[in-house]
């Protein structure tokens, strides 16, 4: 009740245009909460004064404690972000209006919190109205990671990993903690400057190998461990084929199926079989691990997979969506093992069109677990691939033919392959980055990618064709999860156009009617452009984000009208659900009740929403880990010079990307050859004396002057040329 009463007191004060006497404040609070007595209200008023939440003026009237200016009585709500200086910016809900919040007016709000705020009666600066937070509606997160540091006086301090976190942390219990421990803690309560927290988990010592990566994992809300009950249930699962499964599944054991994955892969969820039927047609069979057979609905295994949503692939580890006995053993299509699978068979003509398709549950055997390196060496003539059978080698050559056919069709349809460089961070045995290489995407990688795209399209069309008949019995809409990708927004394309002009990159201007092949044609028209890699990256930034949805709106980037994610159920929850839908509505509908089907259909919207959130978290975690390792790597190269390309120009500096994909900032103060003015109209910096222009696409030589692993920031200075 006291927290609610405190909130009521601050709300009453906030709505007053002038300072309010304590007696009138108490009266208004009692009108809102009649069950209180006046003494309790006055006690809480005194407590709020002590906490500096409210302030008593010389005339004994009360105001919000931290406000030095008069404020508008209208209370607004929005999401707050905080910059590196500690100041806030609130985007008002349901509007595009943004407000500036000086750090002294944050009132305990942390980044991405939902807050109530009031405008201050103060002259706007930089077109932003000043505001002050008066209430925290909801925290974006309550779990944080920090380092436990002991002090000479016997006390301690929690150095929080998040550089934007400014509250002083007091732990309820420090038992077992030693200097240097990295910990996960949960905030229980807070004031504007302090917080009481409970210890959730000791991650390890800061000097432990991998504790840096684990700290980022926990800070992003990912649990790298499984509940013992989940592990126990998973450990009891084993491969078996009962009479019903034997009857309902087709045996494709005689097919010489192979898998092609990165070296060392342990969670193999897809395998391929290719056969050239004649000069006009190819047979393509894609077999996918049948995770849904083992992970049944309404089990703790399924609940945990739903909560995680995806596996997370990091520089030094994989955090799986499912326990290892499932992801690396009974569901992984390991060489020489019989496995449950769902297979998508297709016949594809010489133009890349899928002429026939069938999707069904099966039992398979992986005859050879191949690596991308092995297959690429075979294709490039570097290896005779002696360990593969003659049949396998013939199949690989036919698969390569089919890959080119499928790729040419997708390009003709408008598929855009941005071919963005991906970094591969090499660590030593202590987890220190010793090299940054570029991940090579060769024929084998692109071939498997094209085969999986074909399977995802075929399964979507198959489901729509076969579910329609079943659904008439249940009066349900098409229950499915699609992977969709909207066309880029006009605003984003207009921003890209500004950059394109500066780089002399020619594009058409009909943004309203943009089609997938519009963008591929832009790249074709400029295929010899010196800055094509940078342009591809800028263009990719302007694209919409792909997502999981229950309504099919097509996939713009793949130039596909029908697309889902079917091929990775070991590591993606939506794929598992697509398999489950196939079982419930097509493969074995008589084994499920209408109630079970309706229950799953009603949950699909929630599944897509949570899967989208979990995907964002996983991607952010991967980027955060890479950024930390980049900074750690560059810290070993302070003072060294590198060649890079300007990727962004702003009022505070210039971002430069090196050939190894590492990006750093040249702050304005580190452009020492001149004083520069920022020209916002064309996003350039112009030297006042020498009139030198710095713009996107410039090739520059930089020197590393600072790299901070914790903030994940790298600073360069421009080397005179």
Curated annotation (Swiss-Prot):
<dbReference type="InterPro" id="IPR050180">
    <property type="entry name" value="RNR_Ribonuclease"/>
</dbReference>
<dbReference type="InterPro" id="IPR040476">
    <property type="entry name" value="CSD2"/>
</dbReference>
<dbReference type="InterPro" id="IPR004476">
    <property type="entry name" value="RNase_II/RNase_R"/>
</dbReference>
<keyword id="KW-0540">Nuclease</keyword>
<feature type="domain" description="RNB">
    <location>
        <begin position="249"/>
        <end position="587"/>
    </location>
</feature>
<dbReference type="InterPro" id="IPR003029">
    <property type="entry name" value="S1_domain"/>
</dbReference>
<feature type="domain" description="S1 motif">
    <location>
        <begin position="639"/>
        <end position="719"/>
    </location>
</feature>
<dbReference type="Pfam" id="PF00575">
    <property type="entry name" value="S1"/>
</dbReference>
<protein>
    <recommendedName>
        <fullName>Ribonuclease R</fullName>
        <ecNumber>3.1.13.1</ecNumber>
    </recommendedName>
</protein>
<comment type="similarity">
    <text>Belongs to the RNR ribonuclease family. RNase R subfamily.</text>
</comment>
<comment type="function">
    <text>3'-5' exoribonuclease that releases 5'-nucleoside monophosphates and is involved in maturation of structured RNAs.</text>
</comment>
<dbReference type="Pfam" id="PF00773">
    <property type="entry name" value="RNB"/>
</dbReference>
<dbReference type="InterPro" id="IPR022966">
    <property type="entry name" value="RNase_II/R_CS"/>
</dbReference>
<keyword id="KW-0269">Exonuclease</keyword>
<dbReference type="GO" id="GO:0005829">
    <property type="term" value="C:cytosol"/>
</dbReference>
<dbReference type="InterPro" id="IPR001900">
    <property type="entry name" value="RNase_II/R"/>
</dbReference>
<dbReference type="GO" id="GO:0008859">
    <property type="term" value="F:exoribonuclease II activity"/>
</dbReference>
<dbReference type="Pfam" id="PF17876">
    <property type="entry name" value="CSD2"/>
</dbReference>
<keyword id="KW-0378">Hydrolase</keyword>
<keyword id="KW-0694">RNA-binding</keyword>
<dbReference type="GO" id="GO:0003723">
    <property type="term" value="F:RNA binding"/>
</dbReference>
<dbReference type="InterPro" id="IPR012340">
    <property type="entry name" value="NA-bd_OB-fold"/>
</dbReference>
<dbReference type="InterPro" id="IPR011805">
    <property type="entry name" value="RNase_R"/>
</dbReference>
<keyword id="KW-0963">Cytoplasm</keyword>
<dbReference type="GO" id="GO:0006402">
    <property type="term" value="P:mRNA catabolic process"/>
</dbReference>
